[in-house]
Amino acid sequence: MITIYGKANCGFCTKAKSFADQREFTYEYKDVGMSKDTLNELMDRAPVQVKSVPQIFIGNEYIGGYNEFTKYVEETGYNGTGETL
C-alpha cells in the first residue's frame, strides 16, 4: 500500500496523487495540515528530517518526494501491488 503524506495547495502533492491515479495504484492520502497527529506520524516514520511534502512510502519503505516516487516506479516497474514487473 502506498501512503502519500501531503497538504492542501501543494502542487507536488497533487501531482503525486495524479501519478498514482493514472496508474490505478491504491493509496492512502494523509493531510499533515489537518492533524498534528498525522504530522507527528510522518516525522516518526521518515528516516530523514522532513522539510517538505509530499513524503511517500510504499509499505514500510520510504521513497521520498514526487520525483523520487516517479523515478522509483519507472526504474523498478512497480505496478501498485507491491511487486515489480
Predicted regions and their residues:
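Local sequence-structure signature of Cys/Sec-based thiol-disulfide redox active-site neighborhoods
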Residues: 1-28
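Alpha-helical elements of the RecA-like P-loop NTPase motor core of helicases
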Residues: 14, 18, 40, 71
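Thiol-based oxidoreductase modules, predominantly thioredoxin-like and allied folds used
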Residues: 26-40
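Catalytic phosphate/metal-binding cores of nucleic-acid and nucleotide-processing enzymes, i.e., regions
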Residues: 1, 9, 43, 68-74
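Structural micro-motif
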Residues: 46-56, 66-67
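Short amphipathic alpha-helix with an adjacent loop that forms part of the alpha/beta core around
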Residues: 41-46, 77
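Non-catalytic, surface beta->alpha helical segment in thiol-disulfide oxidoreductase systems
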Residues: 58-85
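Short alpha-helical
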Residues: 11, 37, 64
